Amino acid sequence: MNVERSELLAGIGQDALWALIEGRHGDPFSILGPHQSGGMTIVRVYLPGAEAVDLIDATSGRVVAPFSIAHPSGLFAATVASRTGYRLRITWPDAVQITEDPYSFGLLLGELDLHLISEGTHYSLSRTLGAVAMSIDGISGVRFAVWAPNARRVSVVGDFNAWDGRRNPMRLRPSAGVWELFIPRLAPGERYKFEIVDAEGTCLPQKADPVARASEAAPSTASIVASSTPFRWTDDGWMKGRSRQDRLEGAFSVYEVHVGSWLRDQKDGNRSLDWVELSQRLVPYVSDMGFTHIELLPIMEHPFGGSWGYQPLGLFAPTGRYGTPEDFAYFVDRCHGAGLGVILDWVPAHFPTDVWGLARFDGSALYEHEDPREGFHRDWNTLIYNLGRNEVKGFLIASALEWLERYHIDGLRVDAVASMLYRDYSRNEGEWIPNQYGGRENLEAVEFFKHLNSIIHERCPHAMTIAEESTAWPGVTKPPEQGGLGFDIKWNMGWMHDSLSYIEKDPIYRSYAHGTMTFGMIYAYSERFILPISHDEVVYGKGSLLTKMPGDEWQKFANLRSYLAFMWGHPGKKLLFMGSEIAQPSEWNHDGSVTWDVLDQPQHVGIQRLVKDLNGLYGDEPALQFGDFHSEGFEWAAADDAVNSVLGMLRYAPDRASSVLVMSNFTPVPRYGYRIGVPSDGVWIERITTDAREYGGSGLVNGAVSSEPVPAHGRPVSLSLTLPPLSTIFLQGPSP
């Protein structure tokens, strides 16, 4: 090596030089960029594949100094008299590139940001980590940052550097284990990943950005630099008017949707609709049907479509399958414009093992537990988040807030809560590790949920959290300060299983299972419940709701009408999966579409009209809302008539300002002159009967029924009703 080349490499040891060349150097700024040496400034760049490099004046563009080859692998260096503003003119075999030097910029992240990341309390994580399009000193570009504390070297790679991890190694901020680099002249839309060398020197498969706000559509896996331009929302009225308390007290009827299979364009390769098309088709449909909310199965970026989104890897990015993040924001904006709230299914329980994802992200068990007895979920072959690690808790909470704050989401339904609460969930003896007290409770998960809900309700007081929790864990919807987990609503899985097992029976045998339909009221007010007839009940060979019903075709439809109306009359908020509102004959297929063509048949139209009318009555009548969460809003009118398989419920508005009687006859035998005691003397008006001809029924109706001074069911007055076969009826009580 000649003297001139030695001067260009002054202060750089052979080990450091070879570490840079081989892509193992953890401190590239110690070699690259401008450095003072003997009163001069040496600028070094490492650009494998470049033919020549010139240092040019940032203002005039004139060549200040050509770079010399400091090492044939692609290390160039130039010496200048002063450290003034400069740019690089790089000659590649097929192009000339002019850019600022990424290694001329100082520290990027503030110490407070780093402290909050380590503490797990940086709740605006996507504004710090990930790829942020921004300007520094008037120079536009993208700041990249990623948490990888156990890595030896991290580089950002993309089309902009031919996916060569040697070109853009990042700077480590050791206090937080975060790596950072600003690359000038990059813009939103660039594809990128991180290339990581682990502590043992092994170069890992290139990793997608855990905090990316946009990603390629599957099966491609690169992250995409998202726009930093805020979306122009038009939902100010909705945002100012929404109230979590109002939603909890009022009508709450949810239409659950798998975006990719709600409707497909058969004229265009059977493709799923995108967000803009869904805004034009799905939003007006759900609004017209009278639902108050749309709940979307997970739309966070996920590699495997067959997981329905429940195995996500991009917890900050709407999946690229249906459009851009801006398209998704537009969809939410249109929902709000139509008076619909938006709930997202959100999955903090586990993540898939794809090598380009979070699994052993920096060569260590970073996001997951090291021990598979804590870190591997056998049911789903997925990895479990380590909630005992501050950075992981902060990552998850920041993800939740991202959807609520950036995308104006109205609520999160948290998936698989039970799997997080129990250390022995779906594990045999010896396959799990007890907590510090020897118990099965996952204390880290308990504290996580308490903190998650507290932070959400503090920062987004309008937002709701809903737990899919399938056990009897106490206090799921109690505030954390009262020892609860802090959710607003819990799925009532018990009611769902009991009621479906009952309605699937032949009516001959229902009298023996009568208690399964009344049992739910024993615990109905122990939590704030929603009654879920979800996607899980119409898949994996379970059949559709319609095919669950016993009997011939007429009886199947009658059973379904009666069941749905019973659900709407029963205390608890409502959730119905797409397709069930039209009595879809086949079970759900995520690769297909709702079978909308059945609406050519009147019996399916009848079910659809019934659901719309049930939503309308639910929304109009406070008596059907108040008792959802308040025991004083409900009484059994008839709970013990197992012989006739008849159930009667009385629903009351606050202060009993209004009342509704709900009667169900779950046999194919009409009941004439059925006497039922009522609390109010006067005329009771039939608002809905599922046996109405417009719903596909036989047309047995009650109309207006006057009470009679005949005691029944412990009440001094009663009604003599006609209960049509396999039906549910709603009667409005007289004004007090």
UniProtKB/Swiss-Prot annotation:
Q: Which GO terms describe its biological process?
A: glycogen biosynthetic process
The lineage's top-level taxon is: Bacteria
The UniProt record lists the EC number as: 2.4.1.18
Task: Tell me one Pfam family matched here.
Answer: Alpha-amylase
The entry lists its GO molecular-function terms as: 1,4-alpha-glucan branching enzyme activity; cation binding; hydrolase activity, hydrolyzing O-glycosyl compounds
Q: State whether it acts alone or in a complex, and with which partners, per the record.
A: Monomer.
**What is this protein identified as?**
1,4-alpha-glucan branching enzyme GlgB 2
Q: Which organism is it from?
A: Rhizobium johnstonii (strain DSM 114642 / LMG 32736 / 3841)
